[in-house]
């Protein structure tokens, strides 16, 4: 078993600027970074709320994952992200337990994979290994 810690909570939003302003004004959140994630067709804004980070995600393209999510379920919690030390090893353990993985992505900063909600009590879980 690989132990993990909560990395962040992901929220799907229609307007990232409005949502960043809300968390800053209401909760005193600090914007850590904001960037376009082209391979996922979204704008990501990560804010700090004390000991937890929240990723705000706005779609940049019709029919992207976030666009479809919002059309189907509305704005709200999209995923919980759990950080592990070795994603490939962890995925091997999941495979041996017949836990369904949706997809895996990698860039210079991190490797991520998503555990299908069917395998995780209706929750989309992002598993992340930070490389930097």
Task: State where each predicted segment sits.
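N-terminal beta-strand motif that seeds the catalytic metal site of vicinal oxygen chelate
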Residues: 1-18, 75-84
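Short strand-coil-strand connectors
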Residues: 14, 48-50
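Conserved active-site tyrosine of GNAT-family acetyltransferases
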Residues: 19-24, 94
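Short glycine/proline-centered loop/turn elements that form peptide/ligand docking sites
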Residues: 18, 35-40
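Short, solvent-exposed interaction modules
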Residues: 70-96
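Conserved acetyl-CoA-binding loop of GNAT-fold acetyltransferases
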Residues: 25-31, 98-100
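Vicinal oxygen chelate
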Residues: 1-2, 45-48, 82, 91-132
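Conserved catalytic-core motifs of GNAT/GCN5-like acyltransferases
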Residues: 30-37, 104
């Amino acid at each position: 078993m690989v132990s993990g810690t909560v990395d962040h909570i992901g929220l799907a939003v229609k307007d990232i600027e409005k949502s960043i302003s809300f968390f800053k004004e209401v909760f005193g959140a600090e914007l850590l970074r904001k960037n376009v994630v082209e391979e996922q067709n979204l704008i990501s804004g990560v804010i700090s709320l004390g000991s937890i980070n929240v990723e705000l995600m706005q779609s940049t393209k019709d029919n992207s994952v976030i666009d479809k999510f919002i059309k189907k379920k509305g704005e709200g919690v999209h995923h919980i992200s759990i950080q592990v030390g070795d994603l490939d090893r962890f995925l091997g353990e999941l495979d041996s337990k017949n836990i369904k993985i949706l997809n895996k992505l990698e860039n210079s900063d991190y490797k991520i994979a998503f555990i299908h909600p069917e395998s995780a009590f209706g929750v989309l879980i992002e598993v992340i290994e930070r490389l930097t």
